[in-house]
Amino acid sequence: MNTRVVVTGGAGFIGRETIRKLVISGYDVLCFDLAEQIERHKNILSEIGSLGKLTLAYGSILDRNSLRDAMNGADVVIHLAAMLGVKKTEDNKLGCIEVNITGTDNVLAAAVMHGVKKFVFASSSEVYGEPDTNPINESQTTKGKTVYAVTKIAGEELTKGYNQRYPNLDFTIIRFFNTYGEGQVAQFVLAKWVMNALQGKNPVVYGDGNQTRSYGHVDDVTEGVQKILENSVSNGKTYNLGNSTQVRTLKELAQQVIELVAPEKDLEVEVLGDFNGADRIPEREIHIRYCDTS
């Protein structure tokens, strides 16, 4: 297979598993990410590279020159690179706007310059804000509550706009819901709880613990990414990617972590009732959100 795929943010959690699947399937893959990200995960990336064709390219999506070099010869771009984290992005709104909007524009422009055939944009379930109904399907109105969500809505519109002006650039938009799996950093709640349980510490839940989610495993989610890449029926469409079953409150999920990871330890879920010390912002918290993947 000679299809060349560029994955921006390829050294990230979803990026690494996406790259693994594509390399194993015979694609010629280029992982484009910040130098510190690639270096942090170089052992995993080297192991993936031993399975097939993988090129590592250091660069920022704010650097047009490095983007243009990376895009040379590309057939498909999967654009995962973004500034993440509610508190981080709310504390640095201008930085978030620059990376997630200007950066996406740069990636799209480089893709057009090199005649890329398909652009897959990684959006987020955050674009739905606090939904009117659950489960959420793709036709529901977008109404993001955070600057991160607004930048993802803008990225979706940029992607559609480029397709209008350059019809040869097909696109698909993916709205990722909560994802978990091996290799996820501990700033994310499930990974943090697992680490706490292994260390004999109680999982801590901020707020009342009744926030409701459904988590998809990264293996399933990235299988969806590959199917979107490979099927032209996805062109011009938007898809939710996540788990539409196993809906849990955060209290229930934390208890399940204890039972699965450390049943022999005398642990209990600590529900704090507020957000003091959390990386979440109370007025930005989404209470119930899970996806309809039908």
Model-identified regions with their sequence ranges:
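Residue-level signal for the nucleotide or nucleotide-sugar donor/cofactor binding architecture
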Residues: L62, D91, V99-T102, S139, ...
